C-alpha cells in the first residue's frame, strides 16, 4: 500500500496497535498523522513522536 504523501487518521493511537500504526506511517513518509484516542495525554505523546496532532475522541 502506497501511503507516501497521504493524510492518515489513526484511532486508538495512545498505545498498542494504534501507536505502532502511527510509527509505521511516520516511517512511510505520510504527509500528516492525526492520533485519536480517548486518552488525550497518550495520543499527544504519540503525536509528538511522529510530528502529528492529537485529538481526543470516543469512536466506539
Q: Predicted regions: what is each one?
A:
Residues 4-7, 30:
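Phosphate-coordination loops involved in phosphoryl transfer and adenosine-cofactor binding
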Residues 9, 34, 53-55:
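Conserved Rossmann-like nucleotide-binding pocket used by diverse enzymes
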Residues 19-23:
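Residues forming the Rossmann-fold NAD(P)(H) cofactor-binding site
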Residues 47-60:
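Rossmann-fold cofactor-recognition segment
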Residues 7, 12-16, 39:
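Conserved glycine-rich cofactor-binding loop
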Residues 17, 43-46, 50:
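Generic hydrophobic, amphipathic alpha-helix propensity
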Residues 12, 29-30, 51:
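Short glycine-rich hinge loops at helix-strand junctions in the catalytic core
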